[in-house]
């Protein structure tokens, strides 16, 4: 219905007035009086839209809107206890210095750009302007769509029939490097490593049958193992072997799914496949595999590790690894829900799992960056859980109120990185691949989550129960700008430590880092004087140039690389216009 004729003092309501609705006549929905009530001098009453209360438990009932204060405080207290143990033990740790929380978090960050969000009001949140020649977000989103399409073609029916030729000696090296240099995968410790060590020697032998679930895990390990710096292969060779490993994984998945019964091995295979698929930009497969993993968690009663029901097959004193694995599954569930707009899975049902290392019979708290990264990532996940609980709370009805609470949560997440000095640690990291990857995961997950939490703000005015969401909807905010800036800095640092094209594509796939690149580029393109963003311009150019160099020969990701180049060219053109010639 046309809204022409509506005066400046009138506004369009989304509901029909009660009188028109009772008489079953069309209402033009103009407030404060509709077109039918006004000429008859009748009282015009509009119904008040009540925010729908979710019928499902949001997370564990402990994290629901009604009980969030006490329960979250309890969990945070437990995290602080673990952090205190970590700080107490870190003083005796040798080697590279391990960061410790700064207490009040007041220490000034020494990263390239300090936090610039203090003192900004919620009114600073503004939508993107659409009156510019180039929208970097649109350009990069289209490029990512092209990458997804090219990769689907690459692994289509033709590729499925091609052979997988991985030399046995290299396969053994990559398996060994994976277990030595990659962070401990969720629940992988429950699988007998000797099985994986034997696979390279027997996989091509006649009359030898390897279970499909073991093949899925084996090829996933090969995928990660051949990309490690310790494997000492060139970027081009690594790309070919990674593609072969992914192909082997895809081939084994259908047979495995037909045989899967919900064992721990099935759970490990599903989590591995979900991770690898996300790095290959196949988010549909990643999401499907993760849903299966959550089903297996429930089949194994991992969501009841600390409930009163003693029907799990884990001993009470020995399930810290399972607790940690389950918490990592929760973190993935929240992250997928945020960036892929998926419904909650494992967090949709009741679960009761304590943090690891709190039981009196537990082993001593491990020291080092692995533990610190887990504690930091757990706090990040709690912030995201509180964010979703806040969105579903019917008491939060106004957009300014929700925006203000979201900004507070994002600043709290920033404080986590400041306290643990994770960016500073990454800047000084050298060759410890295990620690580097777990710290990078926390940094990339946390700052990406900040950006996507603000993306949700653009949907608050929508009346659709499932509004369409895109990466183009991220409003302007100094908090988001800071998060994007730090993400670009982390990417540049990681590509220095691991100068491989597969590193770049895996990070852009798993963490959708193109959103940070596009947001920062749009900020520069909209600025009146881009010269005030010279440090950011150089950081974007550095990332684009390094990606171009590393991805030579990788046809699938060229649309993404060329899109970054074109955006930087546009920034340079604007910069030249603003620079006086003398």
Role assignments for model-derived ranges:
Residues 1-186, 200-222, 236-237:
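Intrinsic, low-complexity transcriptional activation domains
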Residues 152-265, 271-282, 309-317, 361-368, ...:
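C-terminal transcriptional activation/regulatory domains of eukaryotic transcription factors
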Residues 368, 375-391:
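Extended catalytic-interface subdomain
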Residues 100, 104-113, 374, 467-468, ...:
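C-terminal, low-complexity intrinsically disordered regions in eukaryotic proteins
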Residues 32-35, 51, 196, 267, ...:
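Short amphipathic alpha-helical segments embedded in low-complexity Lys/Glu-rich regions
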Residues 7, 240-268, 292-308, 328, ...:
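Long, amphipathic alpha-helical regulatory blocks in the mid-to-C-terminal portion
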Residues 186-191, 229-234, 301-304, 337-349, ...:
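Proline-centered turn/helix-capping motifs that create local helix->coil transitions or kinks
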Residues 84, 134, 177-180, 275-353, ...:
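Acidic/serine-rich, low-complexity amphipathic helices located in mid- to C-terminal regulatory regions
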């Amino acid at each position: 219905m046309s809204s022409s004729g509506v005066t400046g003092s009138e506004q369009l309501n989304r509901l029909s007035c009660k009188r028109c609705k009772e008489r079953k006549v069309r209402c033009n929905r103009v407030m404060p009086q509709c077109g039918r009530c006004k000429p008859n001098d009748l009282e015009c009453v509009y119904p008040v839209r009540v925010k729908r209360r979710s019928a499902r438990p949001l997370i564990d009932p402990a994290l629901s809107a009604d009980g969030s204060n006490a329960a979250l405080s309890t969990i945070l207290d437990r995290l602080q206890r673990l952090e205190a143990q970590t700080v107490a033990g870190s003083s005796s740790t040798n080697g590279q210095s391990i960061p410790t929380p700064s207490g009040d978090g007041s220490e000034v960050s020494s990263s390239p750009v300090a936090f610039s969000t203090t003192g900004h009001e919620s009114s600073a949140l503004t939508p993107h302007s659409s009156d510019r020649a180039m929208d970097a977000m649109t350009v990069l989103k289209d490029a990512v769509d092209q990458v997804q399409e090219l990769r689907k073609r690459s692994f289509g029916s033709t590729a499925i029939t091609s052979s997988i030729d991985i030399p046995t000696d290299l396969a053994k090296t990559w398996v060994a490097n994976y277990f030595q240099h990659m962070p401990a995968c969720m629940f992988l410790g429950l699988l007998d490593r000797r099985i994986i060590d034997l696979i390279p020697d027997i996989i091509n032998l006649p009359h030898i049958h390897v279970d499909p679930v073991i093949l899925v895990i084996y090829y996933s390990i090969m995928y990660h193992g051949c990309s490690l710096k310790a494997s000492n292969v060139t970027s081009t060779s690594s790309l070919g072997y990674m593609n072969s490993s992914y192909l082997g994984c895809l081939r084994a998945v259908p047979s495995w799914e037909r045989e899967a019964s919900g064992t721990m091995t099935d759970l490990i295979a599903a989590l591995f496949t979900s991770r690898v698929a996300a790095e290959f930009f196949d988010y549909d497969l990643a999401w499907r595999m993760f849903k299966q993993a959550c089903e297996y968690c429930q089949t194994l009663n991992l969501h009841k590790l600390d409930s009163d029901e003693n029907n799990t097959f884990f001993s009470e004193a020995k399930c810290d690894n399972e607790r940690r694995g389950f918490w990592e599954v929760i973190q993935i569930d929240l992250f997928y829900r945020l960036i892929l707009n998926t419904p909650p899975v494992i967090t949709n049902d009741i679960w009761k799992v304590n943090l690891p290392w709190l039981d009196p019979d537990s082993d001593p708290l491990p020291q080092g960056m692995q533990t610190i990264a887990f504690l930091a990532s757990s706090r990040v996940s709690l912030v995201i859980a509180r964010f979703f609980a806040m969105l579903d709370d019917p008491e939060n009805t106004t957009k300014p109120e929700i925006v203000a609470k979201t900004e507070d949560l994002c600043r709290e997440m920033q404080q986590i990185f400041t306290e643990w000095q994770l960016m500073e640690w990454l800047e000084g990291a050298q060759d410890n691949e295990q620690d580097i990857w777990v710290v990078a995961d926390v940094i990339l997950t946390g700052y990406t989550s900040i950006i996507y939490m603000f993306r949700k703000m653009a949907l608050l005015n929508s009346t659709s129960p499932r509004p369409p969401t895109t990466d183009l909807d991220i409003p302007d905010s100094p908090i988001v700008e800071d998060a994007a800036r730090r993400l670009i800095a982390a990417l540049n640092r990681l590509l220095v430590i691991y100068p491989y094209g597969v590193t770049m594509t895996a990070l852009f796939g798993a963490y959708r880092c193109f959103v940070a690149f596009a947001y920062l580029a749009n900020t520069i393109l909209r600025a009146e004087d881009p010269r005030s963003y010279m440090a950011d311009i150089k950081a974007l150019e550095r990332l684009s140039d390094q990606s171009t160099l590393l991805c030579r020969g990788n046809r699938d990701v060229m649309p993404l690389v060329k899109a970054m180049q074109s955006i930087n060219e546009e920034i340079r053109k604007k910069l030249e216009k603003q620079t006086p010639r003398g």
